């Protein structure tokens, strides 16, 4: 829906894979000297921060478009029985990914894997301020998903000017 998003996402994933390979080898004590690993990790983190910030910004913009529609759809489906809300569960504030990556660098070296970034973020779907994945019934969960799908279709139509077809089973 957003031009350039897919290319940015692919760059992020490629750099993340390189970083995780370096961290795995570091945890096993393989290959490069420690100083060289640290320098390479800083370069990878700089690129991850740039791509991750751009992706998070697009995700937030899309959620601003999607959330009101999804919540209105749910209110209509449930006849106002519960209030749905959506929260972007971010690990960092906008502009804060580079600092978070620096802060967690030593921990990541010990763990042998990436511990933070946009790939670890998620949407939280809430019904009456309670997590829907835990507290909602199966029917409520289906209504939440249907509300989101309808909102996605409406958002896609407003962005592209073309109305998608929804196939519901």
Q: What are the language-model segments listed below?
A:
Residues 32-167:
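Conserved NTPase motor "head" modules and their coupling/switch loops across ABC/AAA+ ATPases, GTPases
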Residues 23-31:
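Secondary-structure edge/capping motif, primarily at the C-terminal ends of alpha-helices
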Residues 1-22, 169:
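Extended, charged alpha-helical "arm/stalk" segments used for dimerization and assembly
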